[in-house]
Amino acid sequence: MDKLDWKIVTALEQNGRQSFAELGETVGLSKSPCWSRVRGLEERGIIQGYAACLNPAALGLEVQSYVEVRISLDAHTEFEAAVMDHPAVSECHTTAGDSDYMLKVFARSVDHLDDLLRHELSKLPGVHRLSTVVCLKTIKQQGRLAEWSRTTQEQRR
């Protein structure tokens, strides 16, 4: 990525809804070359898509938690397929350490979370153990990956 690509991804990370004309003005390109650059970043997989950032609490999902999951060795495929289909799970990551996976889960209340844990998540394929941490307050939700990546790349030179 060159300096112009970094400017583009940084600007889009801050506001993915801007027009190509606005983006071009921000980074110093006209509309057509800006569109071509963005298309190239999409084709290379650097830009994976565009989505609205929703406020879970405004949707009635007041409780955010992280659930560590330990599963049996032969259940990874089935577990991952079940997690992909479960609407309460917004993220799933494989982990190193005592657990196999980390899930980000939203619920309407602590009672709803308790129900999800006892009657749904604990029954996913291969689950041996769940350990849950409830978030009290979100301080930072979306970091600026473009700036961080560019900074660390420059430090390696």
Regions found by a protein language model. Give the residues of each.
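A compositional/biophysical signature of low hydrophobicity enriched in polar/charged and small residues
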Residues: 1-157
